[in-house]
């Protein structure tokens, strides 16, 4: 009944969580335009103001051109065409001297405008890049700080993978949106405003008529922009979910590989990518439709302006000449063009605001327990008296399930108190409340008569040392891991703590001693070694309150007895709280507290509670512990009598070959990234060639618009050489209609670009993410052991590198094609109408090209550096968030924050140089056009005077080349994105071309019809590829007959778990063979081999899905029926628990199984293994996390499961393996003795002493 009540409460909670998650979607999901700059300091505000002013001045340069152009047109047309109405320009009434004077003045105007554009263009871009980098750095820092400051309850209900994606992808989008794009936005606004003012002053009637279409342009841009923001938010959300899956899978890769679940996880990842792809396609279409609508209305405006302008001239309106019409027209054109040019920048800014919404939400979240708080009382010393007063508690993520129900408990200073009870009774909850990871719902927790909520949280936690059941080590050296215990730990203190934790000896055996890297999550250390390093870390804190949560569970008997003694010694003078299933370790405790269903069932010393014959008595009896006689107890195994490891020369021949190879591969890996050309990147889009072709055709069509425009424009100017009003009116109507047609072409071609390139680009992004993730999943484990392939680094590649490849594909190719068509046609038309002038202008073009090349080269370098530093920063962030409980317990938040900041600082140092280069290149390419105009008009005037060119030809050449130059400028703006794309593609190709040594995808190798289960290790030597100087196995030889149960025992680091990994073929031996039924494992098909093996690991990994899906994970080759799932659950003694949950087998287990206790997770892992019905069963400490009742039942289930199977058991608990067919004692990677339990006891050697050390008969 109680189970079903709990179940109903859990169901309500899941429903509540689901609703809560959907709530924000109803609100606006973008921050305000000013709010996005909230992290700007005084200097940033100054830089932004100066940047804005420079943008406004730079923006004013363009509208000044029409004034000069109008003046010149009037001179040319009225002087040459209207008065003489002849094509013999030698006979112009206007004197050559006057024309020379005008052209010289015109040239000086253009040079002046060009100088202003050069100076202010440089200032605006460089200042905005600098301030954006400064603010982005602050946002990254503040976001990470805010996440670390959150209480643990918040982490229970949020997705770590999603947080990592936000930290990389979303903040990158903010950086893009608040940088140089803002400068360009203000420049366009300035051009628009001043252009408008010029137009109104020169001819207000024509300006107002021209402006009548502006509301339509703005309305269409605004509507599309709103749509883009909404779709971007949805797209980012889908990518965040995909990122969460990737993070979960990559951090649990050993489990994924063991159960051959690569394809299943790939599908789960790809499903989220499909959602993102669909939103991405819609976003691209909306963006291009917006652009198409703007250009449609603009061209319509041109037609209207010329038609109405011609009418005003023909009707004799005062002040209106062709020069006036041109000045007004170009002023409005530039204003309108700036609206179009501003749309992409506004869109980038809108995307940044959308991304900032989620980032700022986390930054503004006020935690209920602030890990960085300076408030609260800081007593000079803490005695360690602890009292729980009527404490009730439920986890915030499960508010309806009461874990503690009015707990009252007093612990005196210096006492050792043991908490015992079944799984789920509240033992670990008590420990977490004492650390103030959570606050109780009711009641008080007092330390030295102070409510712990009144104490400063950091100061208080500094007095607590914790050693947990699943110790967390960080991906750095042993030395750093121990020194994380507290600030300013000396080497002497570190070594003393290592000795006390019985870790010193094995550490000194490593070549690098305390500087040995432990690997990601301590992967290079055995369970026992990790546990002892964690104990050393706790002891170095010198805590007043010591919490031991199954602190010796991962240790072998020899280490356990030594560490137990060290812990007992460490407990002296400290308040010690012990959570243990092994009741033999707590008999000497001052007080034993038995918990049941969140309440205190009984308490007292061991003898008292045994006399009561209550719950504690029944727990002790179920463990069947009997005191060995005193003679046996005195025979402890001396660590000094350890057999020395093999002499070095016996393994020299192996080392010399393999270490060299390992070092060579490491060196080559550091330097080799494949060369990536544009063609190689484009080939990635090959399957979408129909979309690319159609998109390209649309781009070519769009590229023809401006060259055609230049011809029509020149025709309109020169048609005033004809005095026939009827002809003029007819021509004006025809040319105006052509402008409208050009507008329709623009709209259709932009829509087609969005439709086809959007699809091609998003499908490519999805495919590349899919391929990259697939390539990662099928690498061998040795690759994941490498430092640079941490989970954080790999998720950064998936999030950032691949998104950047779009900078050289999809719609970017559309822009390049459009610009290439524009430039090509412009040059051809220019040559036809005035080849001399065209030559002059084109001779200047290479300068622009060189500028672009410099910018591209510089940007590629900066992109690579930035990527590398952000990858390192991402690794630190991922590690911190995944192990947040440990970091909070150790109060190491500031240390991780500092490391993260150091990585950001390194990346930030590139910014100033980057700003100078990009600013200079932009300013030069932007201002160069004015200088080209100056030279061109001066030369054009000379050609007209010499009779080698007509004014019409000059206008066509100028307009065509101007649009061609704008196309070059637009292309140069894309250079940085192309650089990033090349850099991202290089990393992607390096990943895709990496061939694993053990290829799980390979179809090669034998697939025997049956697997008997005979195993053999034949002269196996092995070292981990990332530690080639430390041999783990040294010539191991052992035969295991089918159906037999063989147990591996020995001290931590002796090679037990390594043997298990070699059987799974996660690694290959360095020398020797691992044989299955007499066949070398290397000759067998990898997937077939792993399908014959199931493993129950020491630290079970569950996935963020339902219980049924987690059990079905045992066999990923088919859809497993529910009956089979229930059968496996029944065998693992967890079926009745699951049935009591509201959603039964559909209950979600949470991230890393967070909604379940350790024992429940372990039993699910056992069910998962049993479902596979394997021929070979590997049990690596399979019952370590279970309480006594569960252990008995599960042990019985495992004994039953072993029948007819070959079973390899790795354990420290010798009571569990007494019935094994063969017990193998490993020491320093070699077999020291083997036999049955009775035979080894008679030998009275290592095993005999291990048994006695455990005091188990």
From Swiss-Prot:
Segments forming domain ABC transporter: 386-622, 1015-1253
UniProt keyword Transport, yes or no: yes
GO biological process: cell differentiation; eye development; regulation of membrane potential; transmembrane transport
Enzyme class name: translocase
Topology term for the membrane: Multi-pass membrane protein
Entry keyword annotation includes Manganese: no
Positions annotated to bind ATP: 421-428, 1050-1057
Function: Energy-dependent efflux transporter responsible for decreased drug accumulation in multidrug-resistant cells. Specifically present in limbal stem cells, where it plays a key role in corneal development and repair.
Similarity comment: Belongs to the ABC transporter superfamily. ABCB family. Multidrug resistance exporter (TC 3.A.1.201) subfamily.
Note: Acts as a marker of stem-like cells (CSC) in a number of malignancies. Associated with clinical drug resistance, tumor progression and disease recurrence in malignant melanoma and acute leukemias. Responsible for the resistance to doxorubicin of a subset of malignant melanomas.
Tissue specificity remark: Expressed by CD133-expressing progenitor cells among epidermal melanocytes (at protein level). Widely expressed with specific expression in pigment cells. Highly expressed in several malignant tissues: highly expressed in clinical melanomas, with low expression in normal skin. In melanoma, marks malignant melanoma-initiating cells (MMIC), in which clinical virulence resides as a consequence of unlimited self-renewal capacity, resulting in inexorable tumor progression and metastasis. Also highly expressed in a number of leukemia cells. Expressed in basal limbal epithelium.
Cross-referenced CDD domains: ABC_6TM_Pgp_ABCB1_D1_like, ABC_6TM_Pgp_ABCB1_D2_like, ABC_MTABC3_MDL1_MDL2
Main location: membrane
Chain positions covered by the region annotation Disordered: 1-24
Annotated PANTHER family: ATP-DEPENDENT PERMEASE MDL1, MITOCHONDRIAL, ATP-DEPENDENT TRANSLOCASE ABCB1-LIKE
EC code(s) of this entry: 7.6.2.2
Gene encoding the protein: ABCB5
InterPro entries, per the entry: AAA+_ATPase, ABC1_TM_dom, ABC1_TM_sf, ABC_transporter-like_ATP-bd, ABC_transporter-like_CS, P-loop_NTPase, Type_1_exporter
Source organism superkingdom: Eukaryota
Gene Ontology CC: apical plasma membrane; plasma membrane
Protein name, UniProt field: ATP-binding cassette sub-family B member 5
Entry-linked SUPFAM superfamilies: ABC transporter transmembrane region (SSF90123), P-loop containing nucleoside triphosphate hydrolases (SSF52540)
Gene source species: Homo sapiens
Residues that span the membrane, as ranges: 49-69, 110-130, 181-201, 203-223, 294-314, 322-342, 693-713, 737-757, 827-847, 917-937, 954-974
